[in-house]
């Protein structure tokens, strides 16, 4: 049956409703987006397909579609190309190109590109190190995100950076409040996101938070395990009425974490790979009935 724009758009909607897309679903999704790109020349579809390839770590193809959209002056494509070159996804990092694309996007109000541009000033990538410039940019983004409700708004990324600035300035109370908000935003985002970088963000937020406040097991949530599972312990977890035991321990001088008869080398591998009923553990955040330390 020949594709139409309406049918192709329906394929996209149906694909995003799938819990576990199969190979055939992926092919149909790709074909639909390629059709929409050909028929509409809409850069939004180009970035959408580029983003899918990026998530699959097929970075060469992601770059191709981002460049296609950038030629149409699509601001989100500039941001995405900044990531490609900043992290060296298609070779070595190219900070000159990264700065170029982040600057293009930032100048058009893209907040993600703005905080990445700030990072380049902080680290001295392509530009001279300029920490005051970094602080100025990050602080300027804070009012733009106050009142944000979309879990994919860059609240965790900006607030966690601003929290570190406040710690340096001696304002730990404000830093703690920012980290608590960032943690809740990122926890909610992970219910819906399978992007490989989102777990790294929540990990650093949790560790930064517990460098400022004392951990209290009575108020523990799922992502506090990034802090708890760094040393030997035993926990009980209930998700949707089913009990699980999580244990971090040493055996023959080797540290590992176990849950549901599976072992993990460290807390990063645990969060990346632990599954419950074929769903990632981290996506079960809202289904946790209780989580407690055991003796």
Language-model segment annotations:
Residues 134-144, 173-189:
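TPR/TPR-like (Sel1-like) alpha-helical repeat modules
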Residues 116-119, 149-166, 190-213:
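TPR/TPR-like alpha-solenoid helical repeat scaffolds
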Residues 20-24, 55-60, 71, 89-93, ...:
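Short coil/turn and helix-start
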Residues 40-43, 72-75, 87-89, 108-110, ...:
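Short helix-capping/linker turns of helical repeat alpha-solenoids
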């Amino acid at each position: 049956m020949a594709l139409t724009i309406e049918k192709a758009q329906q394929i996209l909607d149906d694909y995003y409703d799938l819990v576990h897309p199969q190979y055939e679903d992926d092919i149909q999704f790709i074909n639909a987006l390629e059709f929409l790109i050909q028929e509409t020349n809409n850069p939004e579809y180009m970035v959408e397909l580029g983003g899918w390839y990026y998530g699959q770590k097929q970075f060469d193809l992601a770059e191709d579609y981002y460049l296609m959209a950038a030629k149409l002056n699509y601001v989100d494509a500039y941001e995405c190309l900044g990531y490609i070159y900043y992290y060296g996804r298609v070779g070595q990092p190219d900070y000159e190109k990264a700065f170029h694309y982040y600057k293009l996007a930032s100048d058009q109000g893209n907040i993600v590109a703005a905080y990445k541009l700030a990072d380049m000033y902080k680290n001295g990538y392509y530009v001279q190190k300029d920490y005051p410039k970094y602080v100025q940019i990050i602080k300027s983004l804070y009012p733009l995100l106050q009142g944000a409700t979309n879990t994919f708004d860059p609240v965790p990324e900006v607030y966690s950076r601003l929290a570190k600035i406040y710690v340096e300035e001696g304002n730990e109370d404000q830093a703690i409040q920012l980290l608590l908000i960032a943690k809740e935003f990122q926890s909610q985002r992970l219910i819906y996101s399978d992007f490989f970088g989102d777990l790294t963000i929540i990990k650093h937020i949790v560790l930064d938070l517990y460098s400022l406040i004392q951990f209290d097991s009575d108020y523990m949530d799922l992502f506090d395990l990034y802090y708890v599972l760094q040393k030997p312990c035993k926990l009980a977890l209930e998700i949707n009425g089913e009990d699980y035991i999580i244990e971090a321990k040493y055996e023959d001088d080797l540290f590992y974490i176990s849950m549901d008869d599976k072992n993990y080398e460290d807390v990063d591998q645990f969060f990346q790979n632990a599954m419950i009923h074929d769903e990632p553990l981290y996506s079960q955040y809202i289904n946790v009935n209780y989580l407690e330390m055991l003796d």
